[in-house]
């Protein structure tokens, strides 16, 4: 269950940092029939709606996590190979001028040192 919560948190954070791609609603080479064109509406008859913008990780989009972010919270993940073991690490921290909080989740996911996950949580408060 904990793996699912962590995976969903990472998906949510990555979706928040993705840049939307704008597509042209009416391209220049499109053709319209005269029967399909709607008459002009008065301001009282206007209908307001929104178009959902698609998100994309295309070139030019900011990297994750965003460098130089002004947010006090940061989350980072890492998968590395140490000898024959593969270790996954997720680190989250929140820093303000009054306190610091940090949490780390580590697990050997593959190899002879395979084990249950380790958790570390710590904090400090400045008077």
UniProtKB/Swiss-Prot annotation:
InterPro entries: Coleoptericin (IPR009382)
Keyword annotations from UniProtKB, A to Z: Antibiotic, Antimicrobial, Cleavage on pair of basic residues, Immunity, Innate immunity, Secreted, Signal
Pro-piece positions: 16-55
Main localization of the protein described in the UniProt heading: secreted
Entry function: Antibacterial activity against Gram-negative bacteria but not against Gram-positive bacteria.
GO CC terms, sorted: extracellular region
Location in or out of the cell: Secreted
Protein name: Holotricin-2
Tissue expression pattern: Hemolymph.
Protein family per UniProt: Belongs to the coleoptericin family.
Leader sequence residues: 1-15
């Amino acid at each position: 269950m904990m793996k699912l919560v962590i995976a969903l948190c990472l998906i949510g954070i990555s979706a928040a940092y993705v840049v939307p791609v704008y597509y042209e609603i009416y391209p220049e080479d499109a053709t319209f029939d005269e029967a399909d064109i709607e008459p002009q509406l008065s301001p009282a008859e206007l209908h307001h709606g929104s178009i959902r913008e698609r998100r994309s990780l295309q070139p030019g989009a900011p990297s994750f996590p965003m460098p130089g972010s002004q947010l006090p919270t940061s989350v980072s993940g890492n998968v590395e190979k140490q000898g024959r073991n593969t270790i996954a690490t997720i680190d989250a921290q929140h820093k303000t001028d009054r306190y610091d909080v940090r949490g780390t989740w580590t697990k050997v996911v593959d190899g002879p040192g395979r084990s249950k996950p380790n958790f570390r949580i710590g904090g400090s408060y400045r008077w």
